[in-house]
Amino acid sequence: MNPPVEANIRKTALNATHRQSGAKMVDYSGWDMPVEYPSVGGLMKEHLAVRAGVGLFDVSHMGDIRVHGPEALKAVQYLTMNDASKLNTGQAQYSAMLYPNGTFVDDVIVHKFADDDYLLVINAGTREKDVNWVKDNTRQFKVTVEDLSDQFTQIAIQGPKGVDTLQKLTDVDLSKVKFYWFTRGTVAGLKNVLIARTGYTAEDGFEIYIPSDAATSDRVWNELLQAGKEFGVVPAGLGSRNTLRLEGKLPLYGHEISDEINVWEAGLDRFLKMDKGDFIGRAALEKAKNDGVKRALVGLETIERGIPRDGYKVLDLEGKEIGYVTSGSYMPFLKRNLALAYVPVEQSALDNIVAVEIRNQPVKAKVVPSQFYKRPKKSS
């Protein structure tokens, strides 16, 4: 039984639907959100359903910032580390906003609507901070910044059967929408819906943006559940979203990335375009690279009994603290106890043995490749 929602906690338009479905609700970054659905078997079943079939996630707590105007591209280029000039209209890009010292304000997905119109999708826990950051750092550009966060219900349809599920409700040929591209079309009778082939589960799938009124949101959610019935669809909560993203080494703000971690340390430099011109954090990152990276994000697998959890200490074999676990869990699909952790570079080689302090006891762990899961390539 869930306690009543406190007055100051925010709710998505689907809140009543989650509660009526018996979801276990938690306070997540000030939002009353479903962590799992005991009625479908909870986190483990949800995780496995997304890997094999399809799961539905309410991700309406995420933020949406529109940057538009004659200097929109210049503004986005200055705000983010990837090269938005390479985007075609209808294409999305993983990127990040950085502080002047090269650490993370937040990671973002940049969507290009037009040459003068972009949408930044940001994290729930950093919404207000991010909106203020964008406004404060684009004053020198001819742009308008709009916080659209409360205008949309955002539903993620994730898993290999996500495309088949959504296809039943739309006139858009989804097979023509490539990964990290988006389009607009009719979904469940709603016109002009943003349909993006994106997600946070290391699986194929889509995210749709619909009007944020409760009646519309509830209807579309239930129609998606009905459409996915033959594929074993389940409603899924933040618990399985976390284990799914962890299997795929997708970073989470406050864990793998934060205002104390720079891009080199996080291993996200493949999204860093130093040659595109000036952007916030560029000079500091150049210096950090020349100075040499001192720590690295690695994968760990315990080789003794114990599950590494977020925040646990990483020790060397003499018992000295050398780092910490950013995210860790038993992985339902892989059936392994795995974690991501920051350790000194000299301790980061594959197969190196360290220890994780679990319940005040050192438990041996091996450094393993950090992308634990890669989705299978589709056969032609």
Curated annotation (Swiss-Prot):
What's an example Gene Ontology biological process for this entry? glycine decarboxylation via glycine cleavage system
What is known about what this protein does? The glycine cleavage system catalyzes the degradation of glycine.
- Which Gene Ontology terms of cellular component type are present? cytosol; glycine cleavage complex
Q: What's the family?
A: Belongs to the GcvT family.
- Which UniProt keyword terms apply here? Aminotransferase, Transferase
One Pfam family of this chain? GCV_T_C
Q: Which reaction does it catalyse?
A: N(6)-[(R)-S(8)-aminomethyldihydrolipoyl]-L-lysyl-[protein] + (6S)-5,6,7,8-tetrahydrofolate = N(6)-[(R)-dihydrolipoyl]-L-lysyl-[protein] + (6R)-5,10-methylene-5,6,7,8-tetrahydrofolate + NH4(+)
Species annotation: Koribacter versatilis (strain Ellin345)
User: What name does the UniProt record give this protein?
Assistant: Aminomethyltransferase
The EC code for this enzyme is 2.1.2.10
Question: Which molecular function term from Gene Ontology is one that the record holds?
Answer: transaminase activity
InterPro entries, alphabetized: GCS_T, GCS_T_bac, GCST_C, GCV_T_N, GcvT/YgfZ/DmdA, GcvT/YgfZ_C, TrmE/GcvT_dom1
Q: Does the keyword Oxidoreductase apply?
A: no
Q: Which PANTHER family match?
A: AMINOMETHYLTRANSFERASE (PTHR43757), AMINOMETHYLTRANSFERASE, MITOCHONDRIAL (PTHR43757:SF2)
> What's the subunit arrangement here?
The glycine cleavage system is composed of four proteins: P, T, L and H.
